[in-house]
Design a protein with these regions (language model features):
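Ligand-binding pocket segment of bilobal, Venus flytrap-like solute-binding proteins
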Residues: 45-49, 116-178
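Pocket-flanking alpha-helical
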Residues: 12, 32-66, 143, 164-170
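C-terminal functional modules
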Residues: 213-257
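Short helix-initiation/N-cap motifs at beta->coil->alpha
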Residues: 3-6, 24-39, 133-144
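Short, well-ordered beta-strand elements
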Residues: 1-7, 19, 24-29, 104-108, ...
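Periplasmic-binding protein-like
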Residues: 74-81, 139, 162-213, 217
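A conserved helix-loop-strand patch within extracytoplasmic ligand-binding domains
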Residues: 66-113
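Ligand-binding cleft/hinge of the Venus flytrap
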Residues: 14-23, 98-134, 239
Length: 257
């Protein structure tokens, strides 16, 4: 399963193609974060490659304690927060309060129920902001961001790293003095309880996937630049990073499918 985050789409299609090379048949399910965790906990879905810890998805791990498995750590230094274009002359979340009109009193969000949306719902009263949080999606958010930047308009969005938009645009993450959005997080691959026992080779392979800043940025950029052809973009990326991909594949004789 995967949600609409750019990094989640990227690593999910990457995992799918690597598993396909190893002879596995996979089915992708696109859904919001909350239904994904519910489906994993009920054993209806096998794997989710974009779980953020220890803050963003902590509520789901607490709710479904004992029903999920952590396979591995994909990325080491993920962040969430509020983001503005660099030409907007503010640097902190507090400063949003003095410029409500310039931002039309709106923070452009993504899918409802995601960790970053929950944090933003807390940040608005915490910082005393008179803003409404707009529910949309990752692709819709970046489309509105691009439209505003093209016109040099003021806009504030919910943003996170890793994301290709930081390569495409000159952006600034607003300082969060009250630490509503937490510190740096890690992105994990997780599974339903029992998956590792039933599919030890696949679980080990997925758990081995780990990407640096440069690697995940290049993967996301390849997908974003070839919208609608994720499979082809991922295969091309794999061809250019074959040694890395091969390093993730366990010795088959150590596992029985």
């Amino acid at each position: 399963a995967y949600a609409n985050g750019a990094e989640g789409i990227a690593v999910t299609y990457l995992a799918k193609e690597i598993l396909s090379e190893q002879g596995y048949r996979t089915e992708l399910l696109n859904a919001d974060i909350a239904p994904i965790f519910t489906s994993l906990a009920r054993g209806k879905t096998d794997v989710f490659m974009d779980s953020w810890m220890p803050v963003t998805h902590a509520d789901y791990f607490q709710k479904y304690d004992g029903k999920l498995e952590i396979l591995g750590q994909i990325y080491d230094s993920a962040r969430i927060g509020l983001v503005v274009p660099e030409y907007v002359p503010i640097h902190t979340i507090e400063e949003l309060g003095a410029h409500t009109r310039r931002f039309s009193g709106e923070i452009v969000g993504i899918d409802a129920g995601t960790g970053i949306m929950k944090c933003t719902e807390k940040a608005i009263p915490e910082y005393g902001l008179d803003y409404r949080l707009m529910i949309s999606s990752g692709p819709a958010m970046t489309a509105l961001l691009k439209k505003a930047i093209d016109k040099k308009e003021w806009i504030v969005v919910t943003g996170w790293t890793p994301h290709w938009m930081f390569d495409r645009f000159r952006l600034r993450v607003l300082e969060d003095s009250r630490n509503v959005y937490g510190e740096a997080e890690q992105i994990h691959s997780i599974a339903r309880k029992g998956f590792s026992k039933e599919h030890p080779f696949a679980a080990a392979l997925l758990g081995n996937i780990h990407l640096s800043d440069t690697e995940i940025s290049s993967l996301m950029r390849a997908i974003e630049e070839t919208s609608g052809t994720e499979t082809r973009a991922v295969r091309q990326w794999m061809d250019g990073h074959r040694d890395l991909v091969d390093s993730w594949i366990p010795e088959k004789e150590e596992y029985s499918r």
